[in-house]
Amino acid sequence: MLHQQEPIIALATPAGKSAIAVIRLSGQNVISIVNQVFKGKDLNQQPSHTIHFGTINYQGEMIDEVLIALFKAPRSFTQEDSVEISCHGSSYIIQKIMQLFMELGIRLAKPGEFTQRAFLNGRFDLIQAEAVADLIAADTAIAHKTALQQMRGGFSTQLQALREKLIHVGALLELELDFAEEDVAFADRAMLESLIQELLTIIGKLIQSFSLGNVIKNGLPIAIVGKPNVGKSTLLNALLQEERAIVSPIPGTTRDFIEAEINIGGIHCRFIDTAGLREHTTDTIESIGIARTKERMQQAGLIIYVFDLSDESLATIQNAIEGISELGIPYIKVGNKLDAAQPDLLKALSQEDFVFISTAKKQHLGQLEARILELFQLDQLDNSDTIVVNTRHYESLVKSQNALLAVVEGIINGLSNELLMIDLKQTLYYLGEITGEITTEDLLDDLFSKFCIGK
């Protein structure tokens, strides 16, 4: 049921001087309140989705010429009566207009309160509400496409289908309980297990997609590591196409890390050029840099390990690869200085999964970028794929997967329907958390507080 809440106001456009600013109002009687200070047409008599020119006046003094956009309930973003005032973007004018309406009883909106009201009034579910924030924050084509797909209900539809199938399974189990005395079997155990395994496959794919979704939403931190003087800084400069890092033939020049962002295939890749790794150094500052490199490796989403094809031995390279593989972090092996490579070493490494480049001559850098996209399956991204980008969704999916696995285990062990229903209802609960069908006031307050004011 729709309900009009107390009227709220917020600046919907960024603060600061601009040609135009938009002030947003929503809630009970906002159209009548705006009409009190608007000189133009009687707004109370105008239809929804219309725009009207006039002036905002206070105590006989004009504050500004404005355009008023009317949105009457339920045909608005919040599904309440809403008004958007387009005025000149002077900070004085904005402050004066907002102060005027606050004196008339309209309070300042909390962060995300407009979207929260839209959710509470049933305009969309919690997934779609969160997608609004993701859409505003999107600064790459992939992030925009993913947020738009979720805002339009793609993920919600998939979860709803899952819930309906689970409810069907639950209904079969409940029927058997109702007819327990007649010993009627409505749910063949093998059929039930097969159906649940099908649902587990769908949930599993959604969980797996989070590693990609996290990269799409938050970017990919990439640590460039290797021994001193293998060309790490030259690689960073080549990728950036500018001289950002100091390049020197003297080993150990990079004492600290240098960060730079590059957009590769629509993904924000944050490259970190680290101090060269070597076991023995008498330089205290270099030792600190090496320690920081190891910290950065642990924090990275991807490691690019650079080897010098002109100088290093096969045994040294193999030992380094063995060490880095133990970290459990995705990595790409890069052989640099291809133009001066040792023939025997190049031949031996050609049998392995290496990317061979020459940073000095800027050769094959595109192959490295392609490998990054391939590693995270960004080269195979389908517009219809549902990708989990939100940590909250991921955690609830993992919990629902565990609960559903408990149902399968119960079926195998011959547990009663009453016990199976406990885990099945728990699965439905966790899926309901994602869409907002199951939620708490604290969760909503925390979630919407992360939105910008005015949205």
Swiss-Prot record:
Binds 1 potassium ion per subunit. K(+) binds at N229, S248, I250, T253. InterPro entries: G_TrmE, GTP-bd, GTP-bd_TrmE_N, GTPase_MnmE, MnmE_dom2, MnmE_helical, P-loop_NTPase, Small_GTP-bd. GO terms for molecular function: GTP binding; GTPase activity; metal ion binding. GTP binds at residues 229-234, 248-254, 273-276. Its cofactor is K(+). Pfam families: MMR_HSR1, MnmE_helical, TrmE_N. Its EC number is 3.6.-.-. Mg(2+) binds at S233, T254. PROSITE patterns: G_TRME. GO terms for cellular component: cytosol. Keywords: Cytoplasm, GTP-binding, Hydrolase, Magnesium, Metal-binding, Nucleotide-binding, Potassium, tRNA processing. It is an enzyme of class 3 (hydrolase). GO terms for biological process: tRNA methylation; tRNA wobble uridine modification. Its main location: cytoplasm. Residues 219-377 form the TrmE-type G domain. Belongs to the TRAFAC class TrmE-Era-EngA-EngB-Septin-like GTPase superfamily. TrmE GTPase family. Exhibits a very high intrinsic GTPase hydrolysis rate. Involved in the addition of a carboxymethylaminomethyl (cmnm) group at the wobble position (U34) of certain tRNAs, forming tRNA-cmnm(5)s(2)U34. Homodimer. Heterotetramer of two MnmE and two MnmG subunits. HAMAP family: GTPase_MnmE. This is tRNA modification GTPase MnmE. It comes from Amoebophilus asiaticus (strain 5a2). The lineage of its organism: Bacteria, Pseudomonadati, Bacteroidota, Cytophagia, Cytophagales.
